[in-house]
Amino acid sequence: MPLRIRPVVTLAVLAAIAGCGTPAARPDLARWEAALGRPATIDWKREQRLEESFVTPDFTARLYRQRTGPRTEQRVLLMIPHGLRGRAPGVVVPFYDPDRMCGYDLRSKTPLGPERNSAKFGLHLVRQGYVVAAAESYPYNVLTEQEVAKAPSGFGVWRLAADKLARTDPDLTGMGKLTHDARRAMDLLAEAPEADPSRLAYMGHSLGGKTSFYAGALDLRARAVVASDFGIGWDSTNWQDAWYFGARLKGMRAAGLEHGDLLACMAPRGFFLIAGQYDGEQSRPQLDRAREAYVAAGADAEALRMFDHKSGHQPSFESLRAAYRWLASRLGRPEPDLAFLSELERQQASAPKR
């Protein structure tokens, strides 16, 4: 029988449970909740269906399609390590589609080219023994295939999705939709028999980094977040675009909302920022803004980290090695064997430049 979704836990409740922030900062929590917005309907049947199972040289997979609301669905690729015994830590990896995170074209089941090997987080994680939920994100799970095909070039898909979301869920921002749907992917992962529900995390790049940051801050099931070059400062990237916060951002900034305050709500849970282009030294004030909360929560010195590879938007392999060692320590795993990254790095370096 399909399960029924319960209303999303409010930030104020999460604050009380997690002890996040100081009393003076708690009024900001309600403003974060208001900023993200709420779906028009919160009482809907949770349904998921298994579309297919398959095996690749790197992992065993189950592709699900599940509801994220009364009118929207998402594809979630559950990636299981070969030879898994017992339960393993799990990581949700949100992005435009599962393909680019798992490293395979899901239609043909053939490997993707090596040009973006460093961003194939799902593939990296499953090779280390994690159970991974590679989740499809807004805007592609808001529009039909026909709507995507008819969208103008450039940012047409994004604008079309933002317009549609404004009609169907007028209070919900694009960032709110991204966050909500990532948490539904975490529902699926936490219920998977292969995953250890006490050792869960989010990891994402760019849009996936934004999503992982917000979902991880809200979701107490997540013990850690790794976010790559998403632009933690308001002026670092396009937070003002209609598909993130749109016109609502101006009021948020006027009210004094800063991401360092949202990060403080994660304390003492772990946060690792991979910086490269949109994050860097300009991001440190946000981490410093949260540091007092981490100290007050008794977090260890490694709980809040940034690695700035200074080599552009794509993560460097050096930064990934640091992030994966850190993640293993946060989720109670031994030092990971990352030798496979060297081969991926070699392949990427040898790939024709586009």
Spans of features found by a protein language model:
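Cap/lid segment of the alpha/beta-hydrolase catalytic domain
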Residues: 87, 94-183, 191, 234-240
